[in-house]
């Protein structure tokens, strides 16, 4: 096995270890965001991306913690989050053209709101996941 001392020589704290373990999932999320941004229907792409991200956050609370964290310990995590934000920005721009997202909503807002939805789903019953995702999407719409 690997001793605690060996782990802490490579990772200064638990969050750094969790970031390293979450890198592959974060890469998958970036890839999904890029695919959603190039979808024929941007709104469908956004819904698919949010569902994909929410499922992974619910499956892996450590991954959710990495997405929720404002401070990254590793450059790889910061780079992947920046890449994710760029892809989500492109996706939001496409959805804005359909009139389905407020002009003031940014990629970081979507990530923070999704983290809130994940927390709410974990706190309640899993049966509310689709309802909360629908509420999030409706809340992103411009006021009427």
Q: Where do the model's predicted regions map?
A:
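Short hydrophobic/aromatic patch on the recognition helix
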Residues: 2-11
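Short amphipathic alpha-helical segment with a characteristic S/N-K-E followed by hydrophobic residues
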Residues: 13-18
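Hydrophobic alpha-helical connector segments
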Residues: 20, 31-59, 73-76, 85
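Solvent-exposed, amphipathic alpha-helical segments
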Residues: 28, 32-36, 113-120
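Helical hydrophobic small-molecule/effector-binding pocket
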Residues: 39-68, 92-94, 98-103, 124-126
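Amphipathic alpha-helical interaction segments
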Residues: 44-52, 109-113, 131, 135
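C-terminal peripheral helix-coil segments that are non-catalytic and often amphipathic
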Residues: 82, 86-101, 116, 123-144
């Amino acid at each position: 096995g690997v001793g605690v001392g060996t782990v802490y020589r490579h990772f200064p704290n638990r969050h750094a270890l969790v970031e390293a373990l979450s890198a592959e999932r974060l890469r998958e999320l970036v890839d999904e965001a890029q695919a959603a941004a190039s979808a024929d229907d941007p709104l469908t792409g956004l819904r698919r991306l949010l569902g994909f991200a929410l499922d992974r956050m619910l499956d892996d609370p450590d991954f959710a913690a990495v997405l929720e964290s404002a401070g990254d310990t590793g450059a790889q995590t910061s780079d992947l989050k920046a890449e994710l934000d760029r892809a989500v920005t492109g996706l939001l721009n496409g959805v804005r053209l359909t009139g389905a997202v407020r002009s003031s909503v940014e990629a970081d807002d979507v990530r923070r709101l999704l983290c809130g939805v994940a927390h709410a789903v974990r706190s309640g019953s899993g049966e509310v996941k689709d309802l909360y995702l629908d509420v999030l999407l409706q809340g992103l719409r411009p006021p009427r």
